[in-house]
Structures are given as C-alpha cells and as structure tokens.
Amino acid sequence: MKNKLIIGRYLPINSFVHHLDPRAKLMFVFLFIILIFFCHSPLTYLWVFALILFIMRLAKIQLWFLIKGLTPIFFFLIFTLMMHIFLTKGGYVLVEWHGITIETNGILEGLYISLRLIGIVMIATIMTLSTSPIDLTDAFERLLAPLKMFKLPVHQLSMIMSIALRFIPTLMDELDKIILAQKSRGSEISSGNIATRIKSFIPLLVPLFISAFQRAEELAVAMEVRGYDANVKRTSYRQLKWQLRDTISLTMIIPIAIILFVLKYSGV
C-alpha cells in the first residue's frame, strides 16, 4: 500500500477475528469506544491497550500495520496535545514564561485525549481490516433494523456507509497516482514550508474531485444495470449466523470494564 491510510481497507486473512459475526464486531467497537472514555489513569489505559494488542494478535495483524494507520491523524494528535498543554490549567506549574504556563494537568489531559483517539482509531482499523465492506453493511443494517418502525431508511444508510468505506482507500490510491503524476512533471509537493505545501496541494484537488465524480457515476450506472433498487426489500446470499464464539468474544469486554470501574472508584 503506497498511501498511509489503512482504515477502510479489508485484509483477507484466516483468523479468529475474521470469522466472527460482523454484528459482534460492530457492537464490540461501540462498547469499546464507550469504555475508553472511562479511562482516567496510566494503569487504566494500560489495560485498554493490552486488550487492543490481544485482539490484534487474534486477528493476525502486525503492530506496525496499525501504527502506520495512525500516521494520517498524527498532526491532529499533536495539535490536540499542544492545545491541552497550553490551555488546560491545574496541578503543578512546570514552565512559566511571559505569562504562558505549562501545568501538569494540561500535559496529562492532552496525553489522555490523544491515547483515546489512538485507541479508537486502532480498534476501528482492526474491525475494517478483518471485516469485508459487504459484511459491515449487512451487520449495520441488521443492528439498525428496529429503527425501521420509525420510518428511517436503514438500508439506504447502510449502503451509504458501505460505499463511503470502500471509497476512502480508492480515493487515497487515486491521490497517490495524481501526486506521482505531478512529481513527474517537476512539481515540488513534499518540499518547502507549510504554506508552500498547502498551495502545492491545491492543484491536486481538482483532478481528485473529477475522479471521485467519475467513479461515483460509474458506480451508479453499474448498480442500475444490475437492477439495484433501494425501495425493494433486499435478500442476502450470505446469511449472518450468530454463534457461541460471538457471544464469548463480546463478553471479553466485561472483565476489562469491571477492572476499569474498580480502578476508577478506588482512586488508582
């Protein structure tokens, strides 16, 4: 993979996580996101990331692959960390210079927020790498099926999510091709200061948007040719079957949740 965006891609591997019901994986990710917001200390984050590493091993995904997937949000993580360092007050004053103070609470809050974002991106990356877009769409539609009684277009929402997930890596691959084409013409995209780099990326947006609209039109024509109708009840060739291993896997998060709550209310 030439580009660094990993999330949204499917990695076909014969692993325990790959064979789990996609509904179980979606529910696990949802519960994990809720759980990680209860982390409040280094020890609680240690437990959460130990769980991520355990799931990563079950999915047979290498750690460097997940770390590579974090590179697109690297600058956002740095920005979040710096904002908390300079704006969040409390605790001991570490640095004081011309009215600017850096205090311990700011550093801790910045680190904790960054770790939460890293954990969420890593667990979501594992889910997309181990679940095909079709399975994700089916799982999303099945889980939201009760909302149909409120006249919500559940199937259409599921299809939008599936197409969006599929288009993310496709557009990133297209961006790679455009960048290589621009470099072959002598364009300096990766050099210069930040302002220069931003200006150099502007010419990339027009061909990228044109390519995106072309692919969207081709997809719409292909779906229409195959007789796709969003208003007709859809059947699935591959039926989802909830098994005992899915229940066991979903309950893996319970002991971690108990540990985090015990640590939180015991002041550790």
Curated annotation (Swiss-Prot):
It is found in: Cell membrane. It is a multi-pass membrane protein. It comes from the Bacteria. One of its GO terms (molecular function) is transmembrane transporter activity. Keywords: Cell membrane, Membrane, Transmembrane, Transmembrane helix, Transport. Signal peptide: none annotated. The chain crosses the membrane at residues 28-48, 63-83, 107-127, 152-172, 248-268. InterPro entries: ABC/ECF_trnsptr_transmembrane, EcfT. GO terms for cellular component: plasma membrane. Belongs to the energy-coupling factor EcfT family. PANTHER family: PROTEIN ABCI12, CHLOROPLASTIC. Forms a stable energy-coupling factor (ECF) transporter complex composed of 2 membrane-embedded substrate-binding proteins (S component), 2 ATP-binding proteins (A component) and 2 transmembrane proteins (T component). May be able to interact with more than 1 S component at a time. Transmembrane (T) component of an energy-coupling factor (ECF) ABC-transporter complex. Unlike classic ABC transporters this ECF transporter provides the energy necessary to transport a number of different substrates. HAMAP family: EcfT. This is Energy-coupling factor transporter transmembrane protein EcfT. The gene is ecfT.
